[in-house]
Amino acid sequence: MKYSVSPVVRVAVNAKNPADLPKLVSGLIKMSKADPLVQVINTETEHIICGSGELHLEICLKDLVEDYAKIEITKSDPVVPYKETVTSKSSQICMAKSPNKHNRLYVIAEPLNEELVKEIEEGNIKASDDTKITARKLIDKYEWDQHDAKKLWVFGPDQMGPNFLIDQTKAVQYLNEIRDSMESAFQSVTKEGILAEENLRGVRFGIQDVELHNDSIHRGGGQIIPTARRVYYASEMTATPRYQEPVYLCNIATPQDVMNGVYQCFSQRRGVVFSEESVQGTPLLEVKAYLPVSESFGFTAHLRSLTSGQAFPQSSFSHWDIINQDPFDVKSKAYEITMEIRKRKGLKQELPVLSDYIDKA
């Protein structure tokens, strides 16, 4: 069964007593099996529970403590994942040289059509599909160039995400010998983008050209993988990078006389009311609105207080929305988001500089 719920709120948990760590890991595994809407990510440094919302996470944590792990835990504040994307074609063909200076890679990035991205996320276009069928769909429905459609190498991250790596070269020697290295770097970059190591979404990387050393010993993975990572990052940076944030669709049943409170609540949280309809046979209105997930914490209590407890909201994940601000502009909300995420992840507080990722001929 496919659930139309996306895990868009996450919290990091740990055992209060380090000796209880095995019980925590075991409890997390049991919980993820019991609740198909929960996603658990175990890393060396932290254990993350991803749920569909604030209330869902509260229930998960209660179940973890009382039923699955039966231990005391510590938890972080809830965090919303963002996606990194690009909004234009790279302003230049980016070139990076390998550490030994014997190999050069030329790459550009550009955005994928949003409808195509949704098809991938909904499983209508999969990496496991026949390549000829996928190519035909890209050509017919999305008006792709035939050469590009037939030379789609791989999806990412995790071989299945909504980003593509395409071979746009013409008659290049030894290209197939470095394909695994190029793909490995692509998987890594689409999992951790340049801005704040968030997943990429809707980015197509096109390999324009490669210049490789004749001797295979000089073009192994140790030379190609770090070079490919640099050039992919450079092409993301030159293609107007932006964040995408998750957005809830909120359905609210409310009497007409407290609508001012509904509008006030959404306007204070960057939300947008887009529909109001009378519910037949009742004095209620059915209101539909979009609300950024990052603004949803405490939303229900806030709405109830502004409407004297008369508005009843239900929220579900709707879509990813572009935050159309430059993350490199220190006055922007996007810059603020970048700094928050980088601080949380223990990354440098300075933003990356293009000259560190690109080489001159």
Language-model features, listed with the residues they occupy:
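Accessory interaction regions appended to the cores of large information-processing enzymes
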Residues: 1-361
